[in-house]
Amino acid sequence: AASGVATNTPTANDEEYITPVTIGGTTLNLNFDTGSADLWVFSTELPASQQSGHSVYNPSATGKELSGYTWSISYGDGSSASGNVFTDSVTVGGVTAHGQAVQAAQQISAQFQQDTNNDGLLGLAFSSINTVQPQSQTTFFDTVKSSLAQPLFAVALKHQQPGVYDFGFIDSSKYTGSLTYTGVDNSQGFWSFNVDSYTAGSQSGDGFSGIADTGTTLLLLDDSVVSQYYSQVSGAQQDSNAGGYVFDCSTNLPDFSVSISGYTATVPGSLINYGPSGDGSTCLGGIQSNSGIGFSIFGDIFLKSQYVVFDSDGPQLGFAPQA
């Protein structure tokens, strides 16, 4: 039975986490995204100017084309990509998926053209939301799941230092105490779970649902919760240019916690200072609005405090404080 460890590395301010993946012999740096289910890569089919600064996949070298298959995906931040589809061998942390669908980009939006840190995405949500037509394809995890020692993966993202994706096993050295599991509703293709209540600084409130999303930088919550949090941060104000609430960089921030099946997951205030806002004097908050989408997004700001097990048996999520 297989298992493996892949190291993720944050970019500046922990904006995204990059992990090396070998596809048909070429190693690309991909953003692992538990909020989507497409494995797409920069390819030699893109205009040469858009390949600049990237490792690119050359499908004609090792790939086998799925004739007539196409894909097109758009993300919550407005970015998008599309192209055609090949199968190839894909290796992550020593675990290899044979005949894995690899979505070769032929068009990418400006956001991806400008981001030279990543060479594509590796989706780890449920395969039901894979965008390949006419027939959706399985994610890397779903392809290898049956060969793993346990049908799960786990993630530890860290602040400005490398972390891990563990495939097929749980590394008890990466967390303290014991894991608390909670059920997942995957009807929309996401790792969605419920929190029973939350505490923002000195104020508390009722629970809500959210998704565990490694591909989102911030912790995105209902407006009422966000305003309640920043009402406790002196001098905090909305700055639409910066992307939400900002505050003086020296401000001490309150903690934010959620109760999950009896376990309290706490994001320390120090992690809620995302980094410089870009205006030269303030910092951007790591908690921001979910734009009224009806659920919360537990992105990297939240995940940095936890070791999280994504278990396809159930399915369920396991949480414990990072060691």
Swiss-Prot record:
GO terms for biological process: proteolysis. Disulfide bonds join C249-C283. Glycans are attached at S3, T7. It catalyses: Hydrolysis of proteins with broad specificity similar to that of pepsin A, preferring hydrophobic residues at P1 and P1', but also cleaving 20-Gly-|-Glu-21 in the B chain of insulin. Clots milk, and activates trypsinogen. Pfam families: Asp. Secreted aspartic endopeptidase that allows assimilation of proteinaceous substrates. The scissile peptide bond is attacked by a nucleophilic water molecule activated by two aspartic residues in the active site. Shows a broad primary substrate specificity. Favors hydrophobic residues at the P1 and P1' positions, but can also activate trypsinogen and hydrolyze the B chain of insulin between positions 'Gly-20' and 'Glu-21'. Monomer. This is Penicillopepsin-1. It comes from Penicillium janthinellum (Penicillium vitale).
